[in-house]
Amino acid sequence: TRDPERLISAIVAHADLRSPRLDEVLEAHEAAGRGLLRGIRDALSHAKHPEVLRIPGRAPAGLYADPAFRAGVARLGERGLSYDTWHYHYQNPEMLELARAVPGTTMVLDHFGTPLGVGPYASQRDEIFEQWKLDIAAIAHCENVVAKFGGMAMPPIFATTFSQWAM
């Protein structure tokens, strides 16, 4: 039941999904969240170039394929929690493989797999957008993946403008 006086109705927290202490961390989040924990967000945006947004301490390349990471994502599903992810367009195929490997976990694709349009990608916007559409279409076939429509007004990071979004 939703309490109209409650300001927060759900929490998506952070955890290192590779941690051998993942269950402990999730239990602590659940206790602190007083029943509001719904998922874990772990941004795997791995920037290859300095012109692209880099966040210190972010994920190393190839983390989607890491067996410990995949086990952590699977554990979320077992606990009824979702996995939120944010990454760049060239990581969409890796995320697709993760979604197929862990079908029991609901995954939230943040920022639609961020098709980049800055730095070395600025001159490849059309090609990137075409490949991005193919990748997103493949991801859309995974019943355990939903997309969060957010961050789309962050030009010039994206390879497209809103007028191109009709597919």
Predicted regions: what they are:
Residues T1-R79, A99-A101, A122-S123, E130, ...:
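Mid-domain alpha/beta scaffold segments of enzyme catalytic cores
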